[in-house]
């Protein structure tokens, strides 16, 4: 029984209706069944174009591009929709050759490309510059670029993907119409490359124009903040997102957590995480990554352990972050457990995870396991080699260089990081060989490699050769190598030369000023240090924590409380005061040496993340000012919080006991040092001898000296004799009083 034309059309319409239903919940089995039904109703040669187009579209949506291609190839006739649909499919899944072939065929049959054609081709991830510029020209020729913002936005994304930022900016400027999506893509492009200033310019323009900002508007800028680590702008964007009601959107929350973490404000990152109404795996990865970079990286491991309680399973990004934490604190057993979890859960150890494992074992000093992980990876890339080389560079220089040569023989081209790593472990002969390889491969003018070469020559006591490298550089030398030279001068004690070189820089950066300030500080040019710091502020160069540490160290040396308090006020304005533990520790030390215990306690209480150094600095300050009992209580509190005291912690508490006359407590702690894995050194014995001698326990002090595992030095004997003299003087004074009575 044959179907009439009307019946056939009705059946085809029903097939298309069913295909549209299937599109809402795509299923390969249902699509194939409908495809078979359409062939049954009428042969392949009689299938209408609109039916075939729908089948191609659904196969493309399911990722079955080869089947979509077969349907396209068998079509008796095609229209522009047919060509655009299959071009989109091939482009989406990276088959640029087939996409371009269909595009050429389309033009051959006289079909002019439209926006859908060009945007489909531009979305292909593997499209090269030549093809991209050709499409750019065609879009201008056929008026597609000028029609609306869609094609221009696609071109902008393509140039961004190809890292052609200037071309992307030119496209943006030439576009007659710009959609919000265009602006968002441009900001994202700039943000991901760390151009925060330019990114913020576009963001402020959008705000000025009264545009309705979306999540994407914030994401690109926040990425730029993360790259540049600008805390002030992070806060501004946070406020702006709150005003727009976007601060609860999970993607914005995740980006803010990441930005605060990268800027070193772990407190705000944790607060954002806790205040979020809901989390996803990206939220967990962001907070783990943020806390991993904090003063207490073990928090990241605790968060990792708590993930299953909240219904989340770690993914590749999570494992990479926690392996980084394990390597940072050198917890070999913890990292091994994570490695075991990966194997148990059947996680495939690809390039990213493999590199993380290589790096973890290398940083923990287990080069054997690091090499095993390296050998296990099938398709190695240069990152794998860099991770392995970095491990051997810190432990075994000759093997590191042997691996470097092996890498070259296997055809891998070194990056600037590869050279920098290999240069760490060079002796003079190997350094000269590597230098020749660097020149041969054209890296001699690379600032990063040039700086590493200078450090290596300086490390091998070849200072003049290090300085000559600047003269040999063919291109204009940036501030980075010049900073290295200034640093070399400073370490050699040539402070005048260091400051003189910095003063010749047209645009010295924060590091330049820090080197000059540190150089003057080391040579005790106190007034010059203050003048340099003032000049730095007048030049609108933002001080960092190292600048403040240098100035605060000078305040400690001079016991200048007024200057120290002024610097503290400036630190508070730049938001370093509570967020940065390193700065807080130096502030505690400065106030302690200047005799302001009240300020010491205030800074200590305001410090958000206290580490062992924070507690040790407080104990030291309390001890030297006679608050022995309070120092002892703080030491006990340190232990109760899980901190493991080190050699400096014990010197601080023994000094506190010595000043407070607490012989029993002090000697009890001295005897327990080994329980905490700390072997008493000469400084500890000196404190213990002084504690005993100055309190009249001369026999015990002498016995302790005789029992020392190494010969006592002159200061130990001097301490003992001072105690003897003091005790003898006290006895004479007592006898005189008795005689007088």
From Swiss-Prot:
This is Pentatricopeptide repeat-containing protein At3g58590. Belongs to the PPR family. P subfamily. It comes from Arabidopsis thaliana (Mouse-ear cress). PANTHER family: PENTATRICOPEPTIDE REPEAT-CONTAINING PROTEIN, REPEAT-CONTAINING PROTEIN, PUTATIVE-RELATED. One of its GO terms (biological process) is RNA modification. The keyword Metal-binding does not apply. InterPro entries: Pentatricopeptide_rpt, PPR_At4g14850-like_plant, TPR-like_helical_dom_sf. GO terms for molecular function: RNA binding. PPR repeats lie at residues 48-78, 79-113, 114-146, 148-178, 179-213, 214-248, 249-279, 280-314, 315-349, 350-380, 381-414, 415-445, 446-481, 483-508, 509-543, 544-578, 580-610, 611-645, 646-680, 681-715. Keywords: Repeat. The keyword Repeat applies. Disulfide bonds: none annotated.
